[in-house]
Amino acid sequence: MELKKNYKFWFATGSQDLYGDECLSHVAKHAQIIVQNFNESGILPFEVVWKPTLIDSTSIRRTFEEANADEECAGVITWMHTFSPAKSWIAGLQAFKKPLLHLHTQFNEEIPYDTIDMDFMNENQSAHGDREFGHIVTLPHLCICGM
């Protein structure tokens, strides 16, 4: 891959609409913060571009097909914020032809043990969603796990 070209990495966040619009707005905000931090860090050779949260197999497949067609897209970084059913990703992953990096981490650096409730638990299930997603990924990929 020619590094002189102005490539971009897409950041695709998985979730589902089971927990409602408020939860999905938190998911989008968290993903945008991660993208901003990637871009401000200077550790990646190209810009990371936030994509809207993917909540169903149709939007997932469409996003991967658009990534395939976009000559500036060097690859996609995936992250499962809330529990994103892995079966929703199968058709998109089968269609995808570019590098994939699976970011397997929670958004929060620390768990708020004193105030944790079911809303927090439901909204922050990335560990479960990422494990299931990692299991079904059949393309050569890299999985980065955080603490």
Describe the residue ranges of each PLM region:
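Metallocofactor- and cofactor-centric catalytic cores in central/energy metabolism, strongly enriched
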Residues: 1-147
